[in-house]
């Protein structure tokens, strides 16, 4: 299932995520099979871009690469771009958290 939420692009790898803001801690919860998205929890509230900034920071810590939200900035369903990385590397890293 993990392969279905990750797509390679010219710039890196795209990951479809589903975000729950105002959580107790930042964490990867698992895969939402119905939505075909990686479920994550973020401590920051979903106001004034705070959750988006926290998502970027969280993914930078995990992947040690540049991260950008490419769609869904105003929505809990988002797509993030992890720059300069291969799909296989992303899968291996995510498996450590699942």
From Swiss-Prot:
GO cellular component terms, A-Z: cytoplasm
Q: Which InterPro entries match?
A: DUF167 (IPR003746), YggU-like_sf (IPR036591)
List the SMART domains: DUF167 (SM01152)
Q: Which family does this protein fall into?
A: Belongs to the UPF0235 family.
Protein's recorded name:
UPF0235 protein MJ0618
Naturally occurring in which organism (per UniProt): Methanocaldococcus jannaschii (strain ATCC 43067 / DSM 2661 / JAL-1 / JCM 10045 / NBRC 100440)
């Amino acid at each position: 299932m993990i392969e279905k939420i990750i797509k390679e692009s010219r710039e890196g790898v795209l990951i479809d995520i589903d975000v729950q803001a105002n959580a107790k801690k930042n964490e990867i919860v698992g895969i939402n099979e119905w939505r075909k998205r990686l479920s994550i929890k973020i401590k920051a509230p979903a106001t004034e871009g705070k959750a988006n900034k926290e998502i970027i920071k969280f993914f930078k810590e995990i992947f040690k690469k540049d991260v950008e939200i490419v769609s869904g900035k105003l929505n809990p369903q988002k797509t993030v771009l992890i720059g300069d990385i291969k799909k296989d590397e992303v899968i291996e890293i995510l498996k450590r958290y699942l």
